[in-house]
A protein has these predicted regions:
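Membrane-proximal cytoplasmic C-terminal regulatory module of class A 7TM GPCRs
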Residues: 269-285
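Generic alpha-helical transmembrane segments of integral inner-membrane proteins
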Residues: 13, 17-21, 25, 84, ...
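Solvent-exposed interhelical
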Residues: 80-111, 159-171, 239-243
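Interfacial loop-to-helix transition and helix-capping segments at the boundaries
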Residues: 65-78, 114-151, 162-167, 180-200, ...
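Membrane-interface helix-loop-helix regions
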Residues: 8-78, 194-199, 203
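Structural signal for the C-terminal ends of transmembrane alpha-helices
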Residues: 21-26, 88-97, 156-165, 181-186, ...
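Alpha-helical transmembrane segments of multi-pass integral membrane proteins
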Residues: 177-267
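Central hydrophobic cores of alpha-helical transmembrane segments
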Residues: 100-110, 170-180, 219-222, 250
Length: 285
């Protein structure tokens, strides 16, 4: 657990606090009102992963389509919940077998996810048959924690069968492409966990992608900084530029921010034995 705290929280804390302090010039409120109750509520809620309690800062991004300061952070509370669940999963895996338990979790999560997705399509919030699941209690239940376990268990199952799957690398590429096409044109997202798992496996094992770890691990930093960077650019009017220019500028700023976050914050809180640091040290030695 300590390793995960070191990996996740320092960068998370930095991004939340920096955003809260540095975005005040974009607020429509005076400084005295900005650094008031709303500011402290945002800090308090976001620093303990309860982003949904205070997703926005006072007067910030009010003209954007989504006023949330960092809408990407909502998944972190689910990730933390996964880590808290690991000891219990470990206990049952030791007792009944890892493959059995992970298979049960995967099936339960699929039933939850797709069961409520079906009900959301069948019933309007007022009980009238409808294909529009918006604001339905079923559509809200569909995306709660139990439905996210399907991705957690799928990752573990990929690891358990990794050696076997390596022998069928090309077949997995073909199956992944077929699943995506079927999901895109016929099932509208109901098979996403299958083709996404295939993509993760393919990219994780493909030797031709090179060893980017020698420069550091910027994936987490990219994830937690991209939203506020894009929101700021939109608020400043960059979205009115040519789409290609906007894309290049945004990618450059996000890359720069994630690289700085890794070298100034993330790597400094990791132990020297961490595989994230070892990967960089080995390739640079």
């Amino acid at each position: 657990m300590e390793k995960r705290v070191r990996r996740i929280y320092p960068a998370y804390f930095t991004v939340v606090v920096l955003a809260a302090i540095s975005l005040w010039p974009l607020s429509t409120l005076p400084v005295s009102q900005y650094f008031g109750a709303g500011f402290w509520k945002y800090l308090g809620a976001n620093l303990i992963f309860l982003n949904f309690l205070a997703p926005s800062l006072p007067g910030v991004f009010t003209s954007n389509i989504f006023p949330a300061v960092n809408g990407a952070l909502w998944t972190l509370k689910i990730e933390v919940a996964f880590y808290l669940l690991v000891p219990f999963i470990h206990y049952f895996c030791n007792r009944f077998g890892t493959k059995i338990i992970m298979g049960v979790i995967f099936c339960f999560s699929c039933i939850w996810k797709y069961g409520f997705a079906f009900l959301a399509m069948m019933y309007h919030p007022h009980g009238i048959f409808s294909l529009d699941p918006s604001r339905s209690i079923f559509s809200q239940l569909e995306v709660q924690f139990p439905s996210q376990l399907v991705y957690f268990s799928a990752g573990i199952l990929l690891l358990l069968y990794f050696d076997m799957l390596k022998l069928h690398f090309r077949s997995i590429i073909c199956i992944t492409v077929c699943l995506y096409l079927v999901d895109h044109f016929l099932t509208e997202g109901t098979l996403d966990v299958l083709w996404i798992s295939g993509i993760v496996f393919v990219f994780g094992f493909w030797r031709y992608l090179g060893n980017f770890s020698k420069f550091g691990d910027f994936s987490y930093g990219t994830y937690i900084v991209h939203w506020p960077v894009l929101q700021t650019m939109i608020a400043l009017g960059f979205a009115k530029l040519n789409p290609a220019v906007f894309f290049i500028v945004s990618i450059s700023l996000i890359a720069l921010a994630s690289i700085l976050l890794w070298h100034l914050v993330e790597s400094r809180f990791l132990k020297s034995s961490s595989h994230y640091r070892q990967a960089s040290l080995k390739t640079n030695s």
